[in-house]
């Protein structure tokens, strides 16, 4: 059985790790881009940075994630109609010969085509870059077709 001193020490370490993890996205910066908020996402060692404009219902985002394998791709999607993958509208990026390619696609099944296609809402300023740690960052601005401030991602 652990002594109370060992338990306090263990809880202190866990607390420090949680604080470090939750502050992680706040330490990230992007070339000449600033975002009002960020969150470390619970999977894929990824983070989402965003600024929401209530004036025109637009969302300016930076999504950072490592590809699952060398030469792989990353994607961030929102589902404007329900929870779940099917029906999602995705921003996808991959690196080809040192250049990041970013495109949009609709996820209409569990085996999506990953073809370039327009989304159900306007998206502009699509861009991407790689970080020194080999993560891929997707930049985009999108206009949300609904007026609520909560989205399913």
Where are these regions (language model features)?
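Extracellular-facing/secreted segment signature in eukaryotic proteins
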Residues: 2-153
């Amino acid at each position: 059985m652990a002594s109370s001193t060992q338990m306090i020490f263990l809880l202190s370490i866990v607390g420090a790790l949680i604080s470090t993890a939750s502050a992680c996205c706040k330490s990230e910066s992007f070339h000449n881009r600033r975002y009002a908020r960020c969150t470390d996402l619970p999977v894929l060692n990824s983070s989402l940075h965003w600024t929401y404009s209530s004036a025109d219902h637009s969302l300016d985002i930076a999504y950072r994630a490592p590809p699952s394998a060398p030469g792989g791709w990353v994607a961030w999607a929102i589902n404007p109609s329900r929870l779940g993958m099917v029906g999602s509208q995705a921003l996808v990026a991959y690196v080809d010969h040192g250049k990041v390619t970013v495109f949009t696609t609709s996820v209409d099944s569990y085996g999506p085509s990953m073809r370039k296609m327009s989304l159900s809402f306007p998206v502009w300023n699509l861009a991407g870059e790689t970080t020194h740690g080999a993560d891929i960052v997707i930049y985009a601005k999108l206009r949300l077709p609904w007026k609520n401030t909560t989205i399913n991602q």
